UniProtKB/Swiss-Prot annotation:
Note: ARHGAP6 gene undergoes X inactivation.
PROSITE patterns per record: RHOGAP
InterPro entries: ARHGAP6_RhoGAP, Rho_GTPase_activation_prot, RHOGAP6/36, RhoGAP_dom
Annotated Gene Ontology cellular component terms: actin cytoskeleton; actin filament; cytoplasm; cytosol; mitotic spindle
Species name: Homo sapiens (Human)
Rho-GAP domain span: 401-602
Region (Disordered): 1-120, 322-361, 639-672, 709-729, 742-838, 860-945
Compositional bias per record (Pro residues), positions renumbered to this chain: 85-98
Chain intervals with Low complexity compositional bias: 12-24, 326-348, 889-901
Sites annotated Arginine finger: R433
Protein name, per record: Rho GTPase-activating protein 6
Length: 974
């Protein structure tokens, strides 16, 4: 089925078998007028009578129109000529009636009609939805004919009905085009980062981020998955372990050992045991999932009871009133008031449960819109993903990995035992060696297997808890260090001593997240026990007896439980007993080294992080941009950095605790991880702020800021600490361009700024200027002059964010936003909300720099007095700088407030010199205290000598800008 035959069937173009060419041409024109997304050039050339041999011969190539090997420019003329020729009559096409009728309906993105958004696969010319695919490729070919010089991007962007047109570019085609065409920084929504040689990443905007060692728990789920691949590659290339290394699989089904088979047979015989084991003898990931599910069930029951009691308490006042009012009424009214509390207190009715808690049945893909109280539900759903993927035999690549740090995957039993022993057993001599009560240990095991929330108190024996922990590790189907890496861990002893620790670190990176987190918790506990092995003196001067459990003794006990091979039979074990003894010695040495160096083993050095980012940059550059910006924002705030370190090293260990210290944001990928902390809302609002093609974020103080690549010259920039201001008040600061007007003499280290102050165009000079979001007054200024002076391109204040070499000679125009009324005299006036005034913010990118600069420059020339206009390429020295606040410039601000500069007449008569006053007022608004906080703007400086003059000028401004003045602009033009 050729593409040209589709055009014939759809548009009913003229053919040799048609009755008359004129009628067919008119019919095709009438049909094309009903389509809102086709180029008008089609109407004139659709019914021309030319030879159809060439068109039919080349119509078969329409399916390969935008293939990567054929440029659009070379295909344009050929396909244009083929579109004008009448195609041969198709014999296998369906009737053209339904297709033509579908063109008359309005096209929307949800519709599947040919005139709507085309959902097609460009690699397959025919197949499912083949009509839409062929036609979607044919129509751009016709459009490419008249203008063969246009590129594919211009064709897709031109002559279409906006987002609902037929030229909505498919995602996969754009991904291929991204690698074919040279990168355009303005076209990509994410910043392009480049890796330097010293683990430093530089962005297109000039920001530089240096990587540092971080705990492995602080990495996102996607980073940890890529870290496995990077570690696997380095082990194969750099480490000679003389064995085959494979990445362990999470949740694999293992063959049952003889002991497990006997245990399962015994459980089948004992039918009185109605519970399914929840902890012992199960894969580690399943144990964690069971813990999460049980914790979720408990929380839901507790919340339902709380909601039911709250519901009853809320209804009791109404019930009491109605009962007191209707004591003499019928029994039916009394019964109706008593039925509601009885129904609400019933635990079986789900009505008291709020709507949000009944959202557990939703798909995992849409769990990002749950609130903060659903973090445990998120974790339970996320933990159930590996089991579901394994049961459905899905590929690991198909799983959606989060860009946020996942919570600690440590079983509740392991964490409870470690906490109990750290609290009560550090001074117990011979811990893990002294025998325990088998009966009490069996009882504790059954309680954990039933899923009961066991609370280990002081009355529980330390030796019983220690035996329970060893039994849990011994009964795991797969050891904690996995059987795939058994030989690799042992062969690390064959390496040089300086290489052993690095190889162990890479092998730990290969472990699944649940094994890695549990191993970290266990090694941390064993390290604490080993530190209390020797006798020491307490703070009170008393001698404290050590537990005598050194790292070697602990490795001797836990080594065979952490790393062992599967024993198929007792006979095989007896034959290989001598070899097992040698391997046991090696296992003990490996575990001892891990206990002594556990802190360094779970830190990710910068070189591995750099490899992970390079690996991600090849496939997902937007993810690299997201991760690097988050690293910069984390390091910029010390409190977030401390909380991240405390989360990674200590604090929450159990799988029942939420990852409240997670600092990830809403990622470009679907996010399955727990709900993040409240601090991440700041960065999320920065993501949502419309700032052009490149989003600029907070840069930490310790990171070096280099000059912007697009600037003609490099200047200093010193970002200050971020103010603790909520970004919900103003998502961006539009007055950052003020800093380009600062001179070298006004430098002051007291500048404070926010994320929106660093623009791509302006390298900021340090000054005592406060750039928080709170410095914008709630009202816009009312511009003086007639409405004709403000053309359509300059409504209010225009924000430009790019810089060109043309702006080198002169500073940015002083666009200010001042308070139109002093707060002292605005008591009875209705203030316009800030949201309304924000409608007049016009954001211009780098491509409209010249137009916006001309507009604002013209506005400045009209509003500035003649003596203060810039001459040539420089600024007149008589023009004083705007009065920036700060401890370093009170004298300059006071001097500018007390008197105007030379050459400017001070208006005294309001009626006689109205024009000059208007110019001065507008100039003052352009260069006045726009960067002053609202408190400093409106508070009169009683200590200044010119306070009365300043107050009089403020009143004149207010009177001039009031609504009673006919010269003021209308409300809608401000």
């Amino acid at each position: 089925m050729s593409a040209q035959s589709l055009l014939h069937s759809v548009f009913s173009c003229s053919s040799p078998a048609s009755s008359s060419a004129a009628s067919a041409k008119g019919f095709s024109k009438r049909k094309l007028r009903q389509t809102r997304s086709l180029d008008p050039a089609l109407i004139g050339g659709c019914g021309s009578d030319e030879a159809g041999a060439e068109g039919s011969a080349r119509g078969a190539t329409a399916g390969r129109l935008y293939s990567p090997s054929l440029p659009a420019e070379s295909l344009g003329p050929r396909l244009a000529s083929s579109s004008r020729g009448p195609p041969p009559r198709a014999t296998r096409l369906p009737p053209p009636g339904p297709l033509c009728s579908s063109f008359s309906t309005p096209s929307t993105p949800q519709e599947k009609s040919p005139s709507g958004s085309f959902h097609f696969d460009y690699e397959v010319p025919l197949g499912r939805g083949g009509l839409k695919k062929s036609m979607a490729w044919d129509l751009p070919s016709v459009l490419a004919g008249p203008a063969s010089s246009r590129s594919a991007s211009s064709i897709l962007c031109s002559s279409g009905g906006g987002p609902n047109g037929i030229f909505a570019s498919p995602r996969r085609w754009l991904q291929q085009r991204k690698f074919q065409s040279p990168p355009d920084s303005r076209g990509h929504p994410y910043v392009v980062w480049k890796s330097e040689g010293d683990f430093t990443w530089n962005s297109m905007s000039g920001r530089s981020v240096r990587l540092r060692s971080v705990p492995i728990q602080s990495l996102s789920e996607l980073e940890r998955a890529r870290l496995q691949e990077v570690a696997f590659y380095q082990l194969q290339q750099d480490c000679d372990l003389s064995c085959q290394i494979t990445i362990p699989k999470d949740g694999q089904k293992r063959k049952k050992s003889l002991r497990k088979k006997l245990d399962s047979l015994g459980k089948e015989k004992n039918k009185d045991k109605e519970f399914i084991p929840q902890a012992f003898g199960m894969p580690l990931s399943q144990v964690i999932a069971n813990d999460r599910a049980y914790k979720l069930k408990q929380d839901l029951q507790r919340d339902e009871q709380k909601d039911a009691s709250d519901f009853v308490a809320s209804l009791l006042p109404f019930g009491n009133k109605r009962q007191n009012k209707e004591l003499s009424s019928s029994n039916s009214s009394l019964s109706s008031t008593s039925e509601t509390p009885n129904e609400s207190t019933s635990p079986n009715t789900p009505e008291p449960a709020p709507r949000a808690r009944r959202r557990g049945a939703m798909s995992v893909d849409s769990i990002t819109d749950l609130d903060d109280n659903q973090s445990r539900l998120l974790e339970a759903l996320q933990l159930s993903l590996p089991a579901e993927a394994q049961s459905k035999k899905e590929k690991a690549r198909d799983k959606k990995l989060s860009l946020n740090p996942i919570y600690r995957q440590v079983p509740r039993l392991v964490d409870s035992c470690c906490q109990h022993l750290e609290k009560h057993g550090l001074q117990t001599v011979g811990i893990f060696r002294v025998g325990s009560s088998k009966k009490r240990v069996r009882q504790l095991r059954e309680e954990f297997d039933r899923g009961i929330d066991v609370s280990l108190e002081e009355e529980h024996s330390v030796h019983d808890v220690a035996a329970l922990l060893k039994e849990f590790l011994r009964d795991m189907p797969d050891p904690l260090l996995t059987r795939e890496l058994y030989t690799a861990f042992i062969n690390t002893l064959l390496l040089e001593p300086e290489e052993q620790l690095g190889t162990l670190q890479l092998l730990i990176y290969l472990l699944p997240p649940c094994n890695c987190d549990t191993l970290h918790r266990l090694l941390q506990f064993l390290s604490i026990v080993a530190r209390h092995a020797d006798d020491n003196i307490s703070k009170d001067g008393q001698e404290v007896t050590g537990n005598k459990m050194t790292s070697l003794n602990l490795a001797t006990i836990f080594g065979p439980n952490l790393l062992h091979k599967q024993k198929s039979s007792d006979k095989e074990f007896s034959v290989q007993s001598s070899a097992r003894a040698e391997e046991s010695t090696a296992i003990i040495a490996v575990v001892q080294k891990m206990i002594e160096n556990y802190e360094a083993l779970f830190m990710v050095p910068p070189d591995l992080q750099n490899e992970v980012l390079i690996s991600l940059l090849e496939t997902d550059p937007d993810v690299v941009d997201y991760l690097l910006r988050r690293k910069a924002s984390q390091s910029s705030s010390p409190d977030m950095l401390q909380s991240e370190v405390s989360f990674s090293v200590g604090g929450r260990h159990s799988s029942t605790d939420s990852n409240k210290a997670s600092s990830g944001d809403i990622s470009p990928y679907d996010n399955n991880s727990p709900v993040l902390s409240e601090r991440s809302l700041l960065a999320m609002q920065e993501d949502a702020a419309p700032g052009g093609s490149e989003k600029l974020y907070r840069v930490p103080g310790q990171f070096m800021l280099v000059g912007h690549l697009s600037s003609s010259k490099s200047r200093e920039s010193s970002p200050g600490p971020r103010l603790g201001k909520d970004l919900s008040e103003e998502p961006f600061d539009i007055w950052g361009t003020w800093h380009s007007t600062l001179k070298s003499g006004s430098k002051d280290p007291g500048m404070t700024g926010s994320s929106g102050d660093i623009f791509e165009s302006s390298s900021l000079r340090a000054g005592p200027c406060s750039l928080s979001q709170g410095n914008l007054s709630p009202n816009w200024p009312r511009w003086q002059g007639s409405p004709a002076e403000l053309d359509s391109d300059t409504q209010g204040a225009r924000r430009t964010q790019a810089a060109a070499p043309a702006t080198e000679g002169r500073a940015h125009p002083a666009v200010s936003r001042a308070c139109s009324t002093p707060h002292v005299q605005v008591a009875g006036k209705a203030e316009r909300p800030t949201a309304r005034s924000e409608q007049y913010l016009t954001l211009s990118g780098a491509h409209d720099l010249s137009e916006s600069e001309l507009d604002v420059a013209g506005l400045q020339s009209r509003a500035t007095p003649q003596c203060q206009r810039p001459h040539g390429s420089g600024r007149d020295d008589k023009r004083p700088p705007p009065p920036y606040p700060g401890p370093g410039k009170p004298a300059a601000a006071a001097a500018w407030i007390q008197g105007p500069p030379e050459g400017v007449e001070t208006p005294t008569d309001q009626g006689g010199q109205a024009a000059e006053r208007e110019q001065q007022v507008t100039q003052k608004k352009l260069s006045s205290a726009n960067s002053l906080p609202a408190g400093e703007q409106d508070s009169p400086r009683l200590g200044d000598a010119g306070w009365l003059d300043w107050q009089r000028e403020r009143w004149q401004i207010w009177e001039l800008l009031s609504t009673d003045n006919p010269d003021a602009l209308p409300e809608t033009l401000v």
